[in-house]
Amino acid sequence: MLTNHHVIAGADTPGSKVQVTLNDGSRRSAQFVASDVNTDVGVLKIDDANDLPVMQFGNSDELRVGQEVVAVGSPLGLSATVTSGIVSALNRPVRASQGGGESSLMDGIQTDAAINPGNSGGPLVDRSGNLIGMNSAIASPVSYTHLTLPTKA
């Protein structure tokens, strides 16, 4: 399972166990696999995941400004929340706070699809439901400026 490093930073020791909540509300145990503070990407291995669906990856290199996208997440603990918008810009440099310091995340996708605290690590998908990015940062205090890590960088 892909997520953001900042989402699992407290469990970033190899073999650490966490609980993940799926869209249907069920909970599964997962094990920390790896994460990278510089790209804000984390990987978990969900136990007994054979029956879980797998998202298809889209090609973020094929995105165009104005293209419709959908962000999925759990803002404020409200699970399986979906918001829609467009790709506002491509190749935006993203800076995200990481453990008291800052790390640069280059080539982000800017979207006006609402991404709020709790959406981090959730997917940004195209109209066909293909994964094109991972919700990562909000450019505060500016409203409606949301940044996503592309699937292909």
Task: Pin down the residues of each PLM region.
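Serine-dependent protease modules
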Residues: M1-L147
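A short, hydrophobic C-terminal helix/tail in secreted or cell-surface proteins
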Residues: T148-A153
